[in-house]
Amino acid sequence: MAYEAGKIEKKWQKIWQEKEYFEPKDDFSLPKKYILSMFPYPSGRIHMGHVRNYSIGDAMARYYRKKGFNVLHPIGFDSFGMPAENAAIKHGIHPKKWTYENIDYMQNELASLGFSFSKKRMLATSDPLYTKFEQEFFIKMYEKGLIYTKEAEVNWCENDKTVLANEQVEDGKCWRCGHEVIRKKMPGYYVKITAYADELLQDLKKLEGKWPSQVLTMQENWIGKSTGLSFDFDIEENNKISAKKINVFTTRAETIYGVSYIALAPDHEIVNELIDKKLLDQDVIAKIQNIQNQTPRQRQAAPKEGYFLNLYVIHPLSKEKIPLWVANFVLSDYGSGAVMSVPAHDERDYEFAKTYNLAIKKVIYKDENDAQCYTLKEGVLTSSGEFDQLECNDAREKISLKIESLGIGKKVTNFKIRDWGVSRQRYWGAPIPMIKCDSCGIVPQKIENLPITLPEDVVINGEGNPLDKHETWKECICPKCGKKAQKESDTLDTFFESSWYFARFASDDKTWQEKAVDEKSVNYWMNVDEYIGGIEHAILHLLYARFFQKALRDLGYLKDDEPFNRLLTQGMVTKDGAKMSKSKGNVVDPDYIIEKYGADSARLFILFAAPPAKELEWNDSALEGAFKFINRLYEKAMSLECGKLQEIDHQSLNKEEKYARLKVYEALKKSFEVYEESFAFNTLIAACMEALNALNAINHKEVSKEAFYIILNILEPIIPHVCFELSEYLFKCENFKVLKIKDEVFIKDSFNIAISVNGKKRAQIEINSEAKEDEILALAKENVAKWLEGKTIVKEIYIDKKLVNLVVK
């Protein structure tokens, strides 16, 4: 009988759905596994990256179900976002219609791959019910002071006409559309993620060994904790500006005597005052304003650029005059937006000083080091007044104490991470549940009025925010004073939705209407045991999700400190050496692959071609190879007799039969480690292939039947359709359970021993495992007889089952 992938796969997909095989059980006494792959944006079609992500998660989920665990393996759609609006402009279709049609299509695609997702817990973040509880969280966070409003410089994408968080700007471009990003001052809502900066940093220790070290390092660097000294420089008396002092922050207080200039951020208040009063040359003002329009990343990537501001400050200890500059490498949102620049001991300061011919003052020496820029925190101070000859660490402490005693500074801790701006000037997003009242100011909506949903009668043409122009939708009554007011027209950053979806999935779907999260269910399922997704989410989604977990914990919704126990970051799928994309013309359509080869072949190839964390290069011939392997597996299985297994007397088997059985049980042993620890599915598949090759060399019915009983069990999480089909035919699926290792299979009948003469290896022999030492020595001498001729054996050394060494003279 020929292997018909399409027929077999449709049959089993129907059976699994009808039997609700993928739904989690209500029995909370069972051991649980919560396995979650990052949910997709409903773009309209799944791509091979999705296939890889979900094949990995599905293999884990199926394995643990078979092991008797209660498994939660949900899927949903991150369904708000700008592409829906862009589609509305391009194709004249409403974002809602476009989104939900795409969801329907993609659900069918995912089902056709046999992914074992819970259908009852499927959600879309644009569903009104999801919006309702998200808005509830927003209001609770606002009331707790975790969300606030302010006017600030923001990243603005001219193409998408919306604000972007710092994390959403990549190399000066919008992460979504790739358009240049500019800086713009706007009011907006901010999530106070900085309130949790220290906990977010400290709790990374809990994830060591469970998350990739690269992700932990990226988050640690993004949070950017630094402890140092914050202190003031007096501004030399002048009639130009109102400020009298400039505050700076440094982690290198020991270099204070090496300051040769103070550098201000381009948008520092002193710089803006000089521009407003036109106290700088017009061409300088134009150049500074150009820098102000650049994003922080654009500024840092650009060549060092700066301008003297015709002002001086007074050094707090040496009382020297120090020039005041504006520089593009100083960021306004780190420290106070002012840097004490020490060119002799900081490479960036040195580069700027060399460019503009500024003084370079060495104040640290080590071993007569004459480097122009010495950056190590080791050595002794020089040209530092009363602190000369002190070691760096000692000097840092004593200078800090001196500054504190003068009342002009103190030790502080700074973080690089900034509060998360979540206001977006777009239509297709969750409305921010706030009201603007002329009498009361900003007021939250009443919880009982949620959800605040989007109007559908909007014109989407790419010109501003449609909600801002929808007067009837904006009109409302202030819940505080009862007067006419207006709804907030901004919508939430879509990362707000993806920051808590894992908790929603963990809630009992029977309580979804009443509660954001169901306490009993969430306490059982959380936290996520295995989380699978791309490393590109290391800072954005994963950091926001960790913050949300902690914030919702403190609001009483959740109990755990961290949302994801283990994280697996899968590599991207490439073709012709590049990431798959329509623009490169190297996209592989999963629908075509399923149609031609079947879902199991696609899954087998994707898990065999590379370890999950590595890049996977698409290879048509390897896919063909996966298809042929399944065909051979099918043909061999169909040639076997059905029925129960018979006991096998291992000792009665010949050498080839014992070897085949050993290979099968080695694969079984490996399966436990792969599915539970390493996820190196490629090595497990290779072990199964090796076992099947060994089976082809024998003709023992019971050994072959036992082998398939085990191999179909091992491969079911990877190629489920064909394994169910063959297991039903051969064993009525009784093999889908936890299988035990049989120790007798691993007992060797013989072993190899190296034979050396005077320490030099001369031969290797195979010895029966029951042979005695004198028999082994006799056989050894026989095999190296030519090296013993004319010699006397003075010593015989035998190391059990490893080595014989004959010492002769």
Curated annotation (Swiss-Prot):
NCBIfam families: leuS_bact. It comes from the Bacteria. InterPro entries: aa-tRNA-synth_I_CS (IPR001412), aa-tRNA-synth_Ia (IPR002300), Leu-tRNA-ligase (IPR002302), Leu_tRNA-synth_edit (IPR025709), M/V/L/I-tRNA-synth_anticd-bd (IPR013155), Methionyl/Leucyl_tRNA_Synth (IPR015413), Rossmann-like_a/b/a_fold (IPR014729), tRNAsynth_Ia_anticodon-bd (IPR009080). It holds the Pfam family Anticodon_1. A motif ('KMSKS' region) lies at residues 579-583. A motif ('HIGH' region) lies at residues 40-50. It catalyses: tRNA(Leu) + L-leucine + ATP = L-leucyl-tRNA(Leu) + AMP + diphosphate. ATP binds at K582. GO terms for molecular function: aminoacyl-tRNA deacylase activity; ATP binding; leucine-tRNA ligase activity. This is Leucine--tRNA ligase. HAMAP family: Leu_tRNA_synth_B. Keywords: Aminoacyl-tRNA synthetase, ATP-binding, Cytoplasm, Ligase, Nucleotide-binding, Protein biosynthesis. One of its GO terms (cellular component) is cytosol. Its EC number is 6.1.1.4. The keyword Protein biosynthesis applies. It is found in: Cytoplasm. The lineage of its organism: Bacteria, Pseudomonadati, Campylobacterota, Epsilonproteobacteria, Campylobacterales. Belongs to the class-I aminoacyl-tRNA synthetase family. GO terms for biological process: leucyl-tRNA aminoacylation.
